[in-house]
Amino acid sequence: MNEVIKTQNLSIGYNGKPLMTDINVSLNAGDIVALAGPNGAGKTTLFKTLTASIKPVSGEVSLMGRNLSDYSATERASLFSLVLTDKPDDMFLKVLDIVAAGRYPYMGLLARLKDKDREIVMQSLDTVGITALAERNFISLSDGEKQKVMIAKALAQDTPIIFMDEPAAFLDYPSKIELIHLMKRLSREQGKTILFSSHDLELLLRYSDQMWLVAPKKSLKVGSPKELVDNGIIDKYFPPISAKELFSLIL
């Protein structure tokens, strides 16, 4: 498999104090990987470390075979995009302008959109199903619509890797299904690699190729949803969920 991200003996945390240690994982091109675990377990810290928002306590993160720290911010922005729970500082921006900001790695902050950029922006709006919202102010949208805008912005960035932090948050059930189908299309048809976090166990089990499980005072566990269920590992990370319920989710 073609590894796009790999960690070696990675320890993550803040102020030199490790929250998780000995993380040795990899992301393969075209995979959908789910990051799961309770609040406070280290999901956000791992996300921030893999995206160079914070530095590792120790160890290494490799991106496309190079140390992550060797890339400039612009170089990183052409390789991975982010869908975070944070929203734009200027809530009065139009949807079109926010999605167009995804093109900045290719045009610079002061440059104008070229025809190709506009085409990609409009295609991204259409892919997520929000073309009709293009001229709306972001502040006027529902929470679910705002989430779709941020996903469209990541698509406009046109990167081989997409990180999504709670992408299904605020989405109603039909929109969740749309998101799932979109993630599958991006993975299978365009070869996008997607790492997403979620508290939605059905989403995690049913639609990911691989899961990374984190929990306080436990080592990170990696495996396919079926492997983690069959081995009883899911029960240790999601104790309120019975084995019968778990099997019903993935069958």
Language-model features: where?
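The feature captures the beta-strand-to-loop junction immediately N-terminal to the Walker
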Residues: 36-38
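Helix-to-loop junction immediately C-terminal to a conserved catalytic motif
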Residues: 51
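Conserved ABC transporter NBD signature motif
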Residues: 59-67
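Conserved ABC ATPase signature
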Residues: 137-141
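Catalytic Walker B motif of ABC-type/P-loop ATPase nucleotide-binding domains
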Residues: 162-165
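H-loop/switch region of ABC-family ATPase nucleotide-binding domains
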Residues: 198-199
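ABC ATPase nucleotide-binding domains
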Residues: 238-251
